[in-house]
């Protein structure tokens, strides 16, 4: 690349970042149309961090401290939540831009450098969670950010650089080290995917300077976090990860690993990946083919662990194959070109949805939407999406018991010896949480920390109850925060009735004494006290 090309690449990336951020701010708010549960989970964590709480130390989550910190920073600075979300994403994009620019201009030819740079910026600032669905969603932004960082790291590790010499190797190592540290502090599964590839790349190149740079920057970030949060942070982080790994509440959020690899949505991508490995090796690019093969298990694992199982990694595969096919003097170029274009075509719906999302949100501002959160926080949804609460009740038919229908019914949840209806909350989560929280407050129980017997616990966002110190915004198992709870809220319709049953069972097994204080068609409110034998 000439100097003018490098400046043009930086300008193009900055233009994508600036245009998307401007569209987000110009809309005057954000207008999500799905994933309310995940959105409220994100809001809880952001408010915790904006108040100075640390993940793992002050509340339970498998997500790292950086998964929501950019948004929390701007909330803490006084911005409304919607504005803070857009500015936080812009900050992520600005932080990624120099690293992505370096990787693109040093590893990729001009057209693919621009495609890669634009894709990384879209992953940073989109208003959809890296899926092909066009509806605006504020959930799982950390997955997009982690994909962007992972792609930068993989491009540097897998593809050969144009620059030789110690300075270039140190620069590559420093960027990869910072990227690995960021992945560890966003979502650990991405780190698991990246580390083997980086380690193998450094080993094959016998790059001692690069390895030292990776270790130095990575350990430097760990030291900074330790100084800020204390050494107990890492122990608590590991404890949360182990607790989630052991739970059977949500072992994986979508398809099985076999379906991710060989199901109708995944088999084409899997075949393209192995084709790229084979063609790279046939063309003499043995190192690149081996490193892509080493990356495959991690890419599959991340996809398997992510909600929706969307094969975002096909973007990297397309860039990889099209870069190698353009290399002079290499055979199998046509096959690599077909493979690369095939990968980009498969991932195109995701890229288009991300590119359109700021404009879709801008156009949505004319919709008659209402505020989701108390105050003018700028997150707005259609009234029917908030107020129309839909539930599903499992019940046996009046006839047909002789065919074993009763055995297939979910086990009844008992509260104080009486069964709760097997009712599941399907939609209208915001309206449900708001109404129940306000009713608890109006009944004279407001301002007290509540343990919620459900997977989601966003009631405290609406003012009726207080947040639970040490609790879990998204339940994965155990009784996190129970020592600080003054009340237990049992929803009559739960987001996960099996989780409701599990929490009540664990409270009973732990010897806690529950006393009914209030019962409505929507919830049961209980006082909680330890038994005489409890260490509490």
Positions of PLM-derived features:
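Short hydrophobic alpha-helices at membrane interfaces in multi-pass membrane enzymes
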Residues: 156-181, 210-216, 287-295
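Membrane-interface micro-motifs in multi-pass membrane enzymes
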Residues: 122-158, 259-267
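Start-transfer (signal-anchor) and selected internal transmembrane alpha helices
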Residues: 1-23, 112-115
């Amino acid at each position: 690349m000439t100097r003018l090309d490098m400046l043009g690449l930086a300008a193009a990336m900055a233009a994508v970042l600036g245009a998307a951020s401007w569209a987000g701010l110009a809309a005057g708010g954000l207008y999500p149309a799905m994933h309310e549960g995940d959105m409220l989970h994100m809001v809880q964590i952001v408010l915790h961090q904006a108040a100075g709480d640390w993940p793992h130390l002050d509340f339970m989550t498998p997500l790292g401290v950086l998964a929501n910190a950019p948004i929390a920073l701007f909330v803490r600075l006084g911005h409304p939540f919607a504005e803070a979300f857009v500015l936080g994403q812009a900050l992520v994009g600005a932080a990624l831009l120099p690293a992505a620019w370096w990787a693109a201009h040093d590893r990729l030819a001009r057209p693919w450098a621009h495609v890669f740079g634009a894709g990384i910026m879209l992953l940073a600032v989109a208003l959809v969670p890296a899926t092909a669905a066009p509806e605006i969603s504020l959930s799982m932004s950390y997955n997009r950010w982690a994909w962007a960082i992972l792609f930068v790291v993989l491009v540097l590790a897998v593809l050969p650089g144009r620059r030789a010499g110690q300075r270039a190797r140190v620069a590559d190592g420093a960027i990869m080290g910072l990227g690995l540290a960021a992945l560890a502090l966003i979502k650990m599964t991405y780190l698991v995917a990246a580390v083997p590839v980086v380690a193998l790349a450094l080993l094959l190149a016998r790059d001692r300077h690069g390895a030292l740079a990776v270790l130095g920057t990575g350990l430097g970030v760990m030291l900074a976090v330790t100084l800020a949060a204390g050494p107990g942070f890492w122990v608590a982080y590991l404890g949360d990860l182990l607790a989630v790994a052991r739970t059977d509440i949500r072992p994986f959020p979508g398809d099985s690993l076999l379906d991710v690899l060989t199901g109708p949505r995944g088999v084409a991508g899997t075949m393209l990946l192995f084709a790229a490995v084979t063609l790279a090796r046939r063309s003499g690019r043995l190192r690149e083919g081996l490193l892509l093969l080493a990356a495959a298990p991690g890419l599959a694992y991340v996809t398997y662990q992510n909600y929706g199982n969307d094969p975002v990694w096909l973007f990297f595969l397309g860039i990889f194959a099209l870069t190698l096919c353009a290399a002079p003097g290499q055979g199998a170029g046509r096959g690599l070109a077909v493979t690369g274009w095939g990968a980009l075509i498969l991932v195109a719906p995701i890229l288009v949805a991300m590119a359109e999302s700021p404009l879709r949100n801008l156009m949505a501002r004319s919709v008659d939407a209402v505020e989701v959160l108390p105050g003018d926080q700028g997150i707005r949804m259609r009234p029917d999406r908030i107020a129309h609460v839909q539930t599903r009740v499992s019940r046996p038919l009046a006839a047909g018991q002789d065919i074993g229908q009763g055995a297939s019914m979910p086990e009844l949840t008992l509260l104080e010896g009486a069964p709760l209806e097997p009712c599941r909350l399907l939609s209208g989560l915001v309206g449900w949480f708001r109404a129940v929280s306000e009713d608890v407050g109006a009944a004279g129980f407001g301002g007290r920390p509540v343990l919620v017997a459900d997977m989601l616990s966003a009631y405290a966002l609406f003012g009726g109850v207080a947040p639970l110190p040490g609790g879990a915004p998204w339940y994965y198992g155990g009784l996190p925060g129970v020592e600080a709870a003054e009340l237990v809220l049992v929803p009559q319709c739960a987001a996960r009735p099996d989780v409701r049953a599990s929490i009540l069972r664990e409270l009973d097994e732990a010897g806690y004494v529950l006393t009914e204080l209030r019962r409505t068609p929507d919830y049961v409110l209980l006082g909680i006290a330890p038994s005489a034998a409890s260490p509490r």
